[in-house]
Amino acid sequence: MEGLTDRQLEVLRFIASQIEDHGYPPTIREIGEALDIRSTNGVNDHLKALERKGYLSRDPVKSRALIPTSAAREALGGGGEAGSNVVPLVRGPARPGSRMIEIPIVGRVAAGMPILAQERVEDTVQVDAFLLGTNKKVYGLRVQGDSMIGDGILPGDYVFVKKQLNADDGEIVVAMIDDEATVKRVYFEGDRVRFQPSNPRMAPIYVRHSDFRSTMILGVVVGVYRKLT
């Protein structure tokens, strides 16, 4: 594995710390501001180097898709057993002293025709804190339906949700609409709010701002887990 410069290590450490603290990676602009890198091109140069050297996995079309690999975990002092595309998940209580955090699984949520989410804890799972951070407001929901397949969220997946009552434009949220829970991207458009599926065969849900009190954002999706067997 090719070594890192001091600056590259600094960038990698900042990305990892943001995931640890907030449950999601920083944007390119946030990296530049935090580390006094004046241009986005400068940040991108460091990110490309980290990716080329095998320390970072990234999606060029998504600003927050910066995932440290197992090699990065080793470089930063963590374990390296899991692949960069795997969310470690174990049922039952977390072992004392481990880096695993316990996530409650709360009912089910529709990613298609909305169904009522059962607001009760059905199970708990363990997830590596390096991937989701240590935020205690994260919970899991099981997805039904295929309206979010364009974002890689498939029927039977678990979405990990950071509990909050607001969201930024374009984020994937769990929302309660007319007492029904659903997973969609949210867009604020003038006098209405659009909840957009990523399956092109499905239509968006529109809610007028005047009716928004009957629509509650339950949280922002910060991760997805899929069983492979």
Curated annotation (Swiss-Prot):
Residue numbers marked as site, Cleavage: A111, G112
Q: What is its EC number?
A: 3.4.21.88
* GO molecular function (one): DNA binding
Q: What catalytic reaction does the record list? A: Hydrolysis of Ala-|-Gly bond in repressor LexA
UniProt DNA-binding residue ranges: 28-48
Under Pfam families, the record lists:
LexA_DNA_bind, Peptidase_S24
What InterPro entries does its record include?
A: LexA, LexA-like, LexA/Signal_pep-like_sf, LexA_DNA-bd_dom, LexA_repressor, Peptidase_S24_LexA, Peptidase_S24_S26A/B/C, WH-like_DNA-bd_sf
Q: Give the annotated active site.
A: S147, K184
Keywords tagged on the record: Autocatalytic cleavage, DNA damage, DNA repair, DNA replication, DNA-binding, Hydrolase, Repressor, SOS response, Transcription, Transcription regulation
Tell me the Gene Ontology biological-process terms attached to this UniProt entry. DNA repair; DNA replication; negative regulation of DNA-templated transcription; proteolysis; SOS response
Q: Which family does it belong to?
A: Belongs to the peptidase S24 family.
Q: How does it assemble?
A: Homodimer.
What the protein does comes down to:
Represses a number of genes involved in the response to DNA damage (SOS response), including recA and lexA. In the presence of single-stranded DNA, RecA interacts with LexA causing an autocatalytic cleavage which disrupts the DNA-binding part of LexA, leading to derepression of the SOS regulon and eventually DNA repair.
Q: What is this protein called?
A: LexA repressor
Name its species: Anaeromyxobacter dehalogenans (strain 2CP-C)
